Amino acid sequence: ERWAQLLLAAGADEALVMPSAGNPIVFGQKIVDPKAKTVLIYAHYDVMPAEPLELWKSNPFEPEVRDGHIWARGADDDKGQSFIQVKAFEYLVKNNLLTHNVKYIFEGEEEIGSPSLEGFCREHKELLKADVILVSDTSMLGADLPSLTTGLRGLAYWEIEVTGPNRDLHSGHFGGAVANPINVLCGMISKVTDADGRITVPGFYDDVEEVPQAEREMIAHIP
């Protein structure tokens, strides 16, 4: 509800706290021109657990400024960035500088893999329709070096079952002669990547686009 209040105060036409299969999702928008391009801003309001609390110098849920930095749980992931996006939107609205439609979606399950987000997006795809998505959950290379992140790593999960003897075997009689499933699995895992970190699974890179030379050159100039 607090995020919905902030969006309305910043100038949104509407801000809704909407149900999902899990935690509520906040949606807000301001339409300046139905024919204009639309930017959808994604962020998340959930955070990692703050425990152990005794290691904090201040209350993790009461922001405190020390040495020019804001200290609080979520100040860097992702409440701080989310708040900046809202205040930037507020500035554009109040100064009549907003030329594009803006939509916001704040979810509350990013830290556990966003299990409810896909279903919510499918159910409300027309409401969330946009020309570009801006994710406010990335990093900067430095305080004085604004960074535009155009890609992030993904996640993949596999379950591997290695079977061996169907009963206990005496290590003195069979050790070394009969493969231990644990050793076999360790060998498989050790070969998933090579010395340069490239994944060796056949076909893994078949549908992966190469980084364009122009982007490589830009990356090379980053300090």
What are these regions (language model features)?
Residues E1-L53:
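N-terminal helical capping/dimerization or prosegment-like subdomains
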Residues A4, F83-E90, E118, I182-S190:
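Predominant activation on well-ordered alpha-helical scaffold segments within soluble catalytic domains
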Residues L8, K94-L97, K125-E126, P165, ...:
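Generic secondary-structure signature for well-ordered alpha-helical cores
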Residues A36-F106:
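Active-site metal-coordination/substrate-binding segment of hydrolases
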Residues D76-G151:
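Acidic/histidine-rich catalytic neighborhood of metal-dependent amide-processing enzymes
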Residues L141, T150, S171-P223:
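Acidic-enriched catalytic cores of C-N bond-cleaving enzymes acting on peptides and small amides
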Residues S147-T163:
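Flexible glycine/proline-rich, aromatic-decorated loop/lid segments
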